[in-house]
C-alpha cells in the first residue's frame, strides 16, 4: 500500500505554493456548486413539465387558463381606462366647487315690481313672476322652490299689489297681479334698491253715509205717554205768514206714523205758559213728564203772546195745559179773524187702530175729567162757531158710524169749557199747578 501511494504522488504534478494551492481548491469547489445548481434546475423543470401535463389532462383547464390570462389583461386595461376617466373629471369638480353667484340686493317687493313692469300688459301671474326672477338672477335659479312661497306671501300681504281675476275667455290657472296706480312713487327715483315707505291703500269707511249739508226739517218732538206705541207725526199745512212764527230747532227728530195713511194733524208750536215761566222751562217736551197734546187754534193772541216764552224754552214744541185751552177759548172771539186758516185737528192718531175701528167706549176716557176740575169750572158763554165745525168734522172723520155719540162727548167737553170765567186768573193758576204736579193726564 505504501508503494501505491508513492506512485500516485509521483504521477501528480509538483505542489505549488500555498496561495496557489488554496485558489485551486476554491475554484474546484465553485465548479462543483455550479454543477449542483444546474442539476437542481433541471429537476425543477422536469417537475413543472409534469405538472403541466397533469393539468392539461383535467377537463376545462384550458378555459380556466384563458380566463386567468384574460383577467390579467382586463386589469391592466381597466387601470388605464380609470386613468383616462379621472383626468377629464377633475376640471368639472373644480367648477362645481367654485364661487357661487351672490344674492341680488333687491327685496321681494322690488323683484315682483320688476317682473310686473317688464310685462307688456303690466300684469303677471305667480308663475310668470317666478319665471322672470329665476331667468334674470342665477342665485334664485339654483334655489327655486324655496323662495316661491315668499313671493306668494308678499303678493297677498302688501297693498301695492292688486289681484285681478282671470277673464272667463282666458283659460289658465291663477289670478293676475298688477301694481296699484297710487304706488308708482314707491321707490326713490325709480331705483329698486331703496323704498320710500310702506304703501297703504285708503279704504272708504264701511257703512258711512254722505254728510248732509242741510239740517233736517223742523218737526216738533214726539209725545211721551204711558204707552210707547202712541206716537205722533206732525204734518204742517202751508202757512201764509211764516215770518210771524219762530222756526223749530234742527235738534228735533221725526217719528214713525201709526198707520200707512195718517191724517194731517196740527200741533200748536208755541205753548202758552201764562204767568209761570219757571214751570214752562221745566216742562220740556223731551222729558217723560211733559205731555204735548193737540189744541185747536182759535186765535192768534196766544201765539203772539207766548212767542218769547217759546223761544226761551229751546224747543218750541206744544205742551198740553188746561190754561192754554182756556186762553184759546177766551181769545177766540176777537182773534179768529186775524189768525191764519189751519187744517182741522183730531185725536185719532192717539189710537192703536185705524179710525174706522173707533168705538165710543175707547174715545170717552180721552175727554173724561176729574171731579175736582169740574167744581172749579163755572158757567161761560158758548164757544164760537169754528170750534163747533171742527168738532163736527172730527166726529165724522174719526168714526163715520158713531158720529152721534162722539158728538155728544164733544158737546160735553164744550160745556165744561164754557164754565171757565174770563177774569178768574187765580183758578187758572191753581189748575195749571195741579196739572204740572201730576205730569200726565188723569186718564193717561
Curated annotation (Swiss-Prot):
MF (Gene Ontology): DNA-binding transcription factor activity; sequence-specific DNA binding
Source organism of this protein record: Mus musculus
Tissue expression profile of the protein: Not detected in any adult tissues tested.
UniProt keyword list: DNA-binding, Nucleus, Transcription, Transcription regulation
Annotated region (Disordered), positions in chain: 1-70, 234-256
DNA-binding region extent: 102-193
Protein's recorded name: Forkhead box protein D4
Domain notes: Contains two potential transactivation domains A and B.
Matches recorded under PROSITE patterns: FORK_HEAD_1, FORK_HEAD_2, FORK_HEAD_3
SMART domains noted in UniProt: FH
Composition bias type Pro residues, residue spans: 247-256
InterPro entries attached to this UniProt entry: Fork_head_dom (IPR001766), FOX_domain-containing (IPR050211), TF_fork_head_CS_1 (IPR018122), TF_fork_head_CS_2 (IPR030456), WH-like_DNA-bd_sf (IPR036388), WH_DNA-bd_sf (IPR036390)
Gene Ontology cellular component list: nucleus
Localization per Swiss-Prot or TrEMBL: Nucleus
Skewed-composition ranges (Acidic residues): 21-46
Domain of life where this protein originates: Eukaryota
Residue ranges, compositional bias (Basic and acidic residues): 47-56
Amino acid at each position: 500500500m505504501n508503494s501505491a501511494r508513492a506512485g500516485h504522488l509521483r504521477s501528480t504534478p509538483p505542489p505549488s505554493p500555498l496561495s496557489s494551492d488554496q485558489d485551486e481548491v476554491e475554484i474546484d469547489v465553485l465548479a462543483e456548486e455550479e454543477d449542483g445548481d444546474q442539476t437542481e434546475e433541471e429537476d425543477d423543470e422536469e417537475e413543472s413539465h409534469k405538472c403541466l401535463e397533469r393539468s392539461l389532462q383535467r377537463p376545462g383547464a384550458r378555459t380556466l387558463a384563458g380566463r386567468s390570462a384574460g383577467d390579467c389583461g382586463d386589469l391592466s386595461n381597466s387601470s388605464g381606462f380609470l386613468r383616462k376617466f379621472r383626468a377629464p373629471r377633475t376640471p368639472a369638480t373644480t367648477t362645481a366647487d367654485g364661487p357661487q353667484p351672490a344674492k341680488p340686493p333687491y327685496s321681494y317687493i322690488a323683484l315682483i315690481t320688476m317682473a310686473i313692469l317688464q310685462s307688456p300688459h303690466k300684469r303677471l301671474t305667480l308663475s310668470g313672476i317666478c319665471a322672470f326672477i329665476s331667468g334674470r338672477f342665477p342665485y334664485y335659479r339654483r334655489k327655486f322652490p324655496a323662495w316661491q312661497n315668499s313671493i306668494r306671501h308678499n303678493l297677498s300681504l302688501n297693498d301695492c299689489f292688486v289681484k285681478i281675476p282671470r277673464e272667463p275667455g282666458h283659460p289658465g290657472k291663477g289670478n293676475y297681479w298688477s301694481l296699484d296706480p297710487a304706488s308708482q312713487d314707491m321707490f326713490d327715483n325709480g331705483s329698486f334698491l331703496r323704498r320710500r315707505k310702506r304703501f297703504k291703500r285708503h279704504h272708504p269707511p264701511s257703512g258711512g253715509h254722505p254728510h248732509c249739508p242741510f239740517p233736517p226739517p223742523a218737526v216738533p218732538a214726539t209725545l211721551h205717554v204711558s204707552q210707547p206705541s202712541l206716537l205722533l207725526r206732525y204734518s204742517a199745512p202751508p202757512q201764509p205768514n211764516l215770518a210771524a212764527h219762530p222756526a223749530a230747532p234742527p235738534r228735533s227728530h221725526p217719528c214713525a206714523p201709526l198707520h200707512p195713511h195718517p191724517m194731517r194733524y196740527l200741533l200748536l208750536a208755541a205753548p202758552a205758559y201764562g204767568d209761570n215761566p219757571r214751570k214752562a222751562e221745566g216742562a220740556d217736551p223731551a222729558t217723560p213728564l211733559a205731555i204735548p197734546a193737540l189744541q185747536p187754534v182759535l186765535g192768534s193772541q196766544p201765539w203772539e203772546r207766548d212767542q218769547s216764552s217759546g223761544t226761551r224754552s229751546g224747543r218750541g214744541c206744544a205742551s198740553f195745559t188746561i190754561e192754554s185751552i182756556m186762553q184759546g177759548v177766551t181769545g177766540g172771539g176777537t182773534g179768529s179773524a186775524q189768525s191764519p186758516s189751519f187744517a182741522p185737528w183730531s185725536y185719532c192718531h192717539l189710537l192703536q187702530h185705524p179710525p174706522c175701528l173707533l168705538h165710543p167706549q175707547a174715545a170717552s176716557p180721552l175727554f173724561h175729567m176729574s171731579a175736582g176740575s169740574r167744581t172749579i169750572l163755572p158757567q161761560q158763554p158758548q164757544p164760537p162757531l169754528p170750534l163747533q165745525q171742527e168738532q163736527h168734522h172730527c166726529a165724522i172723520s174719526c168714526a163715520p158710524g158713531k158720529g152721534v155719540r162722539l158728538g155728544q162727548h164733544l158737546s160735553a167737553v164744550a160745556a165744561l169749557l164754557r164754565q171757565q170765567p174770563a177774569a178768574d186768573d187765580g183758578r187758572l193758576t191753581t189748575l195749571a199747578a195741579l196739572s204740572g204736579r201730576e205730569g200726565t193726564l188723569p186718564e193717561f
